[in-house]
Amino acid sequence: MPQLDTTTWFITILSMLITLFILFQTKLLNYTYPLNALPISPNVTNHLTPWKMKWTKTYLPLSLPLQ
């Protein structure tokens, strides 16, 4: 079984790390960052129908009447 032969592990792991390091560097160097990030004001919408109480009522175990 070749997995149990640990003589090639160091070379395999080292080559993998070097390859990933080079790939990540090229990916990060090719990324173009935006020049100016200006804040955009969000559009606020007013809803005409408010929440109805039957949908916002919470039932906590301690607030229920005792039986």
Curated annotation (Swiss-Prot):
Any one biological process term the GO annotation gives: proton motive force-driven ATP synthesis
Alphabetical keyword list: Acetylation, ATP synthesis, CF(0), Hydrogen ion transport, Ion transport, Membrane, Mitochondrion, Transmembrane, Transmembrane helix, Transport
A GO CC annotation given for this chain: mitochondrial membrane
One of the record's GO molecular function terms: proton transmembrane transporter activity
PTM annotation (N6-succinyllysine): residues: K54
Modified residues (N6-acetyllysine): K54, K57
Ranges annotated as spanning the membrane: 8-24
Major subcellular location class: mitochondrion
Compartments where located: Mitochondrion membrane
Family as reported in the entry's similarity comment: Belongs to the ATPase protein 8 family.
Record-linked PANTHER family: ATP SYNTHASE PROTEIN 8
Subunit structure: Component of the ATP synthase complex composed at least of ATP5F1A/subunit alpha, ATP5F1B/subunit beta, ATP5MC1/subunit c (homooctomer), MT-ATP6/subunit a, MT-ATP8/subunit 8, ATP5ME/subunit e, ATP5MF/subunit f, ATP5MG/subunit g, ATP5MK/subunit k, ATP5MJ/subunit j, ATP5F1C/subunit gamma, ATP5F1D/subunit delta, ATP5F1E/subunit epsilon, ATP5PF/subunit F6, ATP5PB/subunit b, ATP5PD/subunit d, ATP5PO/subunit OSCP.
Protein name: ATP synthase F(0) complex subunit 8
Organism: Dugong dugon (Dugong)
